[in-house]
Amino acid sequence: LLKTRMKNGLANFISCILPASMILFAGACTKPSPDYIEVSWGDGELVFESIGGEREISVTALQNWLVSVSGDEDSAEWCRITPIAGLAGSAQLTLTVDSYEGEAERMCVLTFVCANQKKEVEVRQTGTDGDAYVYFSDLEFKKMILDEYDSDKDRKLSSEEALQVVRLEFHDTDISSLKGIEKMGNLEYLDCSYNKISGELNLHDLKKLRVAQLHHNLYSSLDVSGCSALDTLIANDNYSYNDAGYMEFPLEEVNLSACTSLTKADFTDNNLTSLDCSDCVSLTDLNCRYNRLSFLDISGCDRLVRLSCRTNAGLSGELDLSHCPDLEYLECYETAFEKLNTNGCSVLKYVYAHNSSLSEVDFSSNKALVHLDIYNNKIPALDVRNNIELTYLDASLNRIQEIDLSRDTELVELLLGYNSVSELDLSGHEKLVRLTANSNALTRIDVSGCTMLENLNVDGNQLTSL
């Protein structure tokens, strides 16, 4: 019975092993359990170009197995796999596909059989008219797209059908590759967050893409260069846990070249060491905190309103924001910046620049400033006479020797501990609630008229009276 169902190669194989293994093989193929068999070949589909080629296929089975090729009458000639049978255990097979001169795609099926288990694997080869269809690397992604956009129900996505895709949104799947998405040239909205997309994520062919929600995945590089319509890019929190339970952050490279319409970008919690936003001339909101940046180029980002580059220990030198007149919110703390230039930022309201290496700051042109947090730096002098809207100032742990606060009567909280200030006049600051000026060199302090003061700490000074 076996010989009548197999071709010559398989018959020869069986004639050699039949005397020794007839009982074992027959028993294995009739038992309903265990009948486990696993077939793998890496990522994606088994798709060959017209030039042909070879692919390695791995088989793991608990019993003896067979594989056959089916399809058109010539499929066994142009698509061959060796060996075609094996015993229980693991084996490496070689799939060979010949070159092809036809225009239309051709296909065959590999059928793996062991006991009651049967697995079919599709093998496809593109013709010379290979651009007629879209080829996917991820079978789950392919199925999702075909279920929605395969209008002629041929279980293939033509280039014309691909252009019907305008919006894609999917979460919590095992999809690991978006290969094939490059043919969806009319795609405007993509939300593939909370998936397992890995390797290189290339979206540079999507010229109409406006929104890309790509966060919580596993890709190592992101290319959106040339996406001139892209307005919103969210690519934060791409991480996984290794076997030891520690977090790993794979995203190391982002290409934003020619993203001239981009207004919002978020790269929080990744592994970036360099970020060039110089082409992003429309950018208003940039978040690149919690990376390993040592290079950040925002020289062309004149429209910035919010910037968070905090917790990047490699960022040093000068942070020059003098070309950002619309800047309102700045987080640059836990960096190694030595100079902060906010000249011309006339609407800047919130500055968080603590735990850094700042030794030079000038806030004289930031007249709208209401919150200034610069503690634990190396600042020797601080002029806030023009910052009359200030309600919160923390300049603790610096090297300040004198400070004039006579015009800053809106202050509610003032923290100046661990400096070298010798005199402090806060008379008439009726809104002041909290004052911390411990561990300075104070010999005189005036808090007369501070009728709202609730918390006062001037320990560790040289005061003889209060």
Each model region followed by its residue ranges:
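Canonical leucine-rich repeat
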Residues: 178-181, 200-201, 222-224, 243, ...
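Conserved hydrophobic beta-strand positions in leucine-rich repeat
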Residues: 166-168, 190-192, 210-214, 231-235, ...
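Leucine-rich repeat
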Residues: 184-187, 205-209, 227-230, 248, ...
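Surface-exposed binding patches on compact interaction domains or structured appendages
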Residues: 36, 61-94
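Consensus "Asn ladder" position of solenoid repeat domains
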Residues: 173, 195, 217, 238, ...
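A short beta-strand micro-motif common to beta-rich folds, especially ectodomain repeats
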Residues: 93, 103-116
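LRR N-terminal entry segment and analogous cap-like coil->beta motifs
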Residues: 153-201, 205-206, 210
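Bacterial Sec-dependent N-terminal signal peptides
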Residues: 23-47, 115-136
